[in-house]
């Protein structure tokens, strides 16, 4: 890996992982209400109306699990870096808005997108996450100083004024049926006022980038990525069965070349499957989650079961309690490494969310030549 001082290189989700960022739970807050967030929190959630720092015992437990995961990866020969947490329990503001708290830095996958030798900071679509990129700047600065070919890019910071959000999304009176109608017609909380995207809405398949259009990424954001990565082909996808479409990695998960697992409640629409089917890829339903409900004070759904981290085309990390997902991947010929992380889910997600690639072996390939 030290050859030519190359530090940053990652073209897909499955080539052998050699260097990764793992998040931290320090100081994580439940953010105060804001337009983007209200639409994401289900009406019956215990998160509604609650904000401020998470309790010390839950932070300590989450950090213990993240530290253990980091140690496991290091024992596998993978270099692990960690972000520098900010004091998230403080108000932040721009000339357009004020947020009572920030969020945290447990899920680097939301903020950082690695494509080849470039790490791109996403715009983010929550006000409470506007400054989150600062947690990763010490690492990115270090990579930039040591790797002469590394590109450190940042998408234009959005203003996130009220014009970015649909007010009618915020009502408690809107039920799931209506929300499903809205998501099927691609009517989301975010408007097309300016480009918005979270990095966790983007999957890398070599020359092709597959991007979820949903709550946290709009069409202008997808267009910005298309213009930015002009040598790539960009495909917008959506999953009509998800009333809260945010981040693609608990819905559509590539395991290795030719194989994707798809959330059976949020299937990729038929016309969007064509790209995969025409090129010999198999899309199969993911196994059912082992849990009926998410952990307390957690934004994510039970489908974090499929939020796995692929270490190489034969090895995958799966949350320890997710026995059905582990069994399925085992039957598909993968070596499954169980990793305890459920008590950290509430801090920002699962094994894929809490990591961001720095270096995977491999080169840029075309996995979808027939288009």
Please name every model-derived segment.
Residues 1-371:
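The feature marks the mature, well-folded catalytic cores of soluble enzymes
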């Amino acid at each position: 890996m030290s050859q030519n001082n190359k530090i940053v290189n990652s073209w897909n989700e499955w080539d052998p992982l050699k260097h990764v960022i793992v998040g931290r739970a320090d100081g994580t807050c439940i953010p105060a209400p804001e337009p983007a967030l209200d639409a994401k929190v289900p009406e019956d959630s215990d998160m509604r109306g609650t904000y401020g720092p998470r309790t010390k015992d839950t932070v300590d437990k989450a950090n213990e699990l993240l530290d253990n995961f980091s140690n496991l990866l290091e024992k596998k020969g993978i270099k692990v870096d960690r972000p520098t947490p900010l004091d998230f329990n403080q108000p932040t503001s721009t000339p357009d808005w004020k947020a009572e708290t920030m969020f945290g830095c447990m899920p680097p996958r939301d903020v950082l997108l690695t494509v080849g030798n470039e790490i791109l900071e996403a715009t983010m679509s929550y006000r409470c996450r506007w400054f989150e990129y600062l947690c990763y700047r010490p690492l990115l600065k270090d990579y930039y100083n040591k790797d002469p070919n590394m590109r450190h890019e940042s998408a234009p910071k959005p203003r996130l004024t009220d014009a970015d959000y649909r007010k009618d999304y915020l009502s408690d009176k809107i039920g799931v049926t209506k929300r499903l109608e809205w998501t099927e017609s691609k009517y989301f909380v975010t408007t097309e006022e300016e480009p918005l995207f979270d990095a966790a809405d983007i999957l890398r398949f070599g020359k092709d980038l597959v991007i979820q259009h949903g709550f946290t990424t709009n069409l202008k954001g997808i267009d910005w990525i298309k213009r930015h990565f002009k040598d790539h082909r960009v495909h917008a996808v959506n999953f009509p069965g998800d009333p809260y479409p945010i981040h693609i990695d608990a819905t559509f998960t590539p395991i290795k070349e030719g194989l994707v697992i798809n959330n059976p409640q949020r299937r990729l629409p038929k016309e969007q499957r064509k790209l995969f089917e025409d090129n010999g890829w198999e899309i199969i339903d993911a196994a059912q989650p082992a849990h009926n409900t998410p952990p307390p004070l957690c934004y994510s759904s039970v489908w974090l079961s499929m939020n796995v981290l692929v270490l190489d085309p034969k090895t995958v990390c799966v949350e320890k309690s997710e026995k059905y997902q582990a069994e399925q991947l085992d039957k598909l010929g993968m070596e499954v490494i169980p990793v305890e992380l459920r008590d950290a889910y509430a801090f920002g997600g699962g094994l894929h969310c809490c990591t961001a690639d720095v270096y995977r072996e491999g080169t840029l390939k075309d996995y979808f030549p027939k288009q």
